[in-house]
Amino acid sequence: MQLTPHEQERLLIHVAADVAEKRRARGVKLNHPEVVALITAHILEGARDGRSVGELMSSGRKLIQRDEVMEGIPEMIHDVQVEATFPDGTKLVTVHEPII
């Protein structure tokens, strides 16, 4: 299988998000890369499904709760920006203060 660097990056994001989701299901508190991977994968898949930018910005803020992450992580992540491919083109999705 030959993958472009862009495709390799997307695959790595999805693998990291899968690992993070399994850890979260076991009750393990998530670290910075795991949180970013989960939010990024959520946005990429939502764009692929045809959801709107606004809808993804809103749902991205509700994805992870403060008690699911390690101490100090909510203060470290102010924005998550993802360039996602929508049916009508590529758009930048920004999730502000993603951990509530």
Curated annotation (Swiss-Prot):
Tell me the keywords, alphabetical order.
Cytoplasm, Hydrolase
Gene Ontology biological process terms from the UniProt entry:
urea catabolic process
Cellular compartment(s): Cytoplasm
**Catalysed reaction, written as an equation:** urea + 2 H2O + H(+) = hydrogencarbonate + 2 NH4(+)
Member of which family?
A: Belongs to the urease gamma subunit family.
Q: What is its main location?
A: cytoplasm
Q: What is this protein called?
A: Urease subunit gamma
Q: InterPro entries recorded for this chain?
A: Urease_gamma (IPR012010), Urease_gamma/gamma-beta_su (IPR002026), Urease_gamma_sf (IPR036463), Urease_subunit (IPR050069)
Carries keyword Hydrolase? yes
Family annotation (Gene3D superfamilies)? Urease, gamma-like subunit
Q: Which GO terms describe its cellular component?
A: cytoplasm
Q: Does the keyword Cytoplasm apply?
A: yes
| Pathway where this protein functions | Nitrogen metabolism; urea degradation; CO(2) and NH(3) from urea (urease route): step 1/1
Task: Indicate the enzyme's highest-level EC class.
Answer: hydrolase
Which species does this protein come from? Streptomyces coelicolor (strain ATCC BAA-471 / A3(2) / M145)
Q: How does it assemble?
A: Heterotrimer of UreA (gamma), UreB (beta) and UreC (alpha) subunits. Three heterotrimers associate to form the active enzyme.
- Name the PANTHER family for this protein: UREASE
What HAMAP family does the database record attribute to this sequence? Urease_gamma
Which molecular function term from Gene Ontology is one that the record holds? Answer: urease activity
Q: What is its EC number?
A: 3.5.1.5
